[in-house]
Structure formats: structure tokens, C-alpha cells
Amino acid sequence: MELNEIRKKLKKELDKGRYEHTKGVMYTAGCLAMAHEYSMEKAMLAGLLHDCAKCIPNDQKIEMCEKNHILINPVEYKSPYLLHAKLGAFLAETVYEVSDPQILHAIKVHTTGEPDMSLLDKIIYIADYIEPGRDKAENLPYIRKIAFEDLDVCMAEILHDTRAYLSSRGGSIDATTKMTYDFYRQYRKKHD
């Protein structure tokens, strides 16, 4: 399926705000790809599809994951909105005909991250955080700047802020997010 065809389909599937965010992530991912010498086309496609399952009601997310043998951990059962990443990778492959394993993986890990992420994984994770429609994060101007300089330091900053935000609100922190934070925190300390 071509990028424009996917955009038209997503415009019908997502609510207006989510569609605008998706376009922002797509273009931001393309810019980051250019800055870090990665395929702009692959980054834009992954950015466009990263939230393709976001507007599915949470009970349906659980049902679809169970039906399609997508593993759900206890934190995801408690916070099923997290499932949109795993389910999104599944839908990108089965509905939007994406076969590139790098794109599918970037969609799958864009919410929790994982230790030692690929270049595309980091581009999508970061683009989701810094796209122009985002304005709530405390360190956003700094994070946007370093996104174009050092993706690993940027990951460390985003994960630090995300962890602090979730802790301050009493939210559950997914085990994978904890491992991702530990990986990038250690990486940053070694390279400061």
C-alpha cells in the first residue's frame, strides 16, 4: 500500500487530533532520518503507522491481542492503551501490508522502548515525543535540539522525564520501559 493511500485510510480510522499527531510524527521522523542518514521513506511510513491502533477502544485492543496471540503483560492489562503499539505493528502488517521487519519493530516498541534500540526504533520513539503538536514536556526545547545531535542522549533525557512524570502521578511503569531507561541511562553516563 502506498503512503498516500495509507494516509487516506488513516484519516478515516483516527480521530482528528490523533491524525494530526500522526502527520506530525511522520514528518518529524522524516527530518530525523535525514539528520541521522537513515531512509526517509521508511521513517515516514513507520511514523505514519505508529498509532494506527490508538483509537481502538481498550477492551477491543485486549480482545484483538488475545485473538491474534499477541502477548499481554500485567501492566498492559492494567493500562491497555499501551497495547496500541503491539497491536499497531500487527495491523501495519495485516491491514496496511507492511512487510519490512524494521518498520514493524519500530511501531511495536515506540511506546515502551527497549534496550539497545535500532536507529529507526529511536527515530520513531523520539519523533513521537517531539513532533510539533507536543507542548507539555518540561525539557522539550532541549530534547528537540539534541534529537538532531545525539539520539542516545535524547533517549536518556526522554526516558528520565517519562519515568519522573509517571512516578509523580503514581502510574505503573512497564518493566520494558524500566529496562530501556536503565540501558540508556548507563549509556549516557559512559559518554558524558
Predicted feature residues:
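Divalent metal-dependent catalytic cores for phosphoryl transfer on phosphate-bearing substrates
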Residues: R7-K12, A35-E157
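A short, charge-rich alpha-helical start-of-domain segment used by transcription regulators
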Residues: K16-R18
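N-terminal glycine-rich anion-binding loops that anchor highly charged ligand groups
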Residues: H21
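Charged phosphate-binding loop/patch that engages nucleotide di/tri-phosphates or the phosphate backbone
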Residues: A164-D192
